[in-house]
Design a protein with these regions (language model features):
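Phosphate-binding P-loop
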Residues: 1-3
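Hydrophobic anchor at the beta1->P-loop junction of P-loop NTPases
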Residues: 6-8
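ATP-binding Walker
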Residues: 11-14
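Walker A/P-loop
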Residues: 17
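Post-Walker A helix-loop "phosphate-sensing" segment adjacent to the P-loop in P-loop NTPases
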Residues: 24-34, 47-51
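ATP-dependent small-molecule kinase phosphotransfer cores
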Residues: 37-113, 121-126, 141-145, 149, ...
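Short, well-ordered beta-strand core segments
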Residues: 115, 131-135
Length: 153
């Protein structure tokens, strides 16, 4: 699977990350959870005391960020950061910035191995030419229970 891109797409709470982690471990692929990048950016915005509605300050902040690291993302799975990530993800400039970051990260990893990326719209928007595209469909009640459990844990 060297130099191949696999995407795992689907709604929140569908199990995209779990599926992607399993495949990454099984096939020795680099795994990128795209949601971590939104959470990392949200954390940076919060640490800089920028109001989530102040798009001008957020856009100015983006100009000063060279790279967003996907490492140590579990620390970012708080309700405050998750809510902020959902809010900023609706902004086109932020989505474009994060999409570009994802492409850079994957390009750097493809030199060494294949990649699997999970996230919403990851196969239809960001990596349209992925070698394999997986779309996860899960009942809404199950998704809601999964999301609730994630927030509690």
């Amino acid at each position: 699977m060297k130099n191949k891109i696999i995407t795992v797409d689907g709604p929140a709470g569908a199990g995209k990350a779990r599926i992607a982690k399993y495949i990454a471990n099984k096939w020795k692929l680099f795994h990128l959870d795209s949601g971590i990048l939104y959470r990392r950016l949200s954390s940076i915005i919060i640490k800089n005391n920028i109001n989530l509605n102040d798009t001008n300050k957020i856009h100015a902040l983006l100009k000063n960020i060279q790279e967003i690291s996907p490492r140590n993302g579990n620390k970012l799975r708080t309700e405050k950061i998750s809510n902020a990530a959902s809010k900023i993800a609706t902004n086109k400039k932020i989505r474009d910035f994060i999409n570009n970051q994802q492409k850079i990260i994957v390009k750097n990893q493809l030199k060494f191995r294949g990649c699997i990326i999970d996230g919403r719209d990851i196969g239809s928007v960001v990596f349209k030419k992925a070698n394999i595209k997986i779309y996860v469909v899960v009942d809404e009640i199950i998704r809601a229970k999964r999301r609730h459990k994630q927030l509690i844990d």
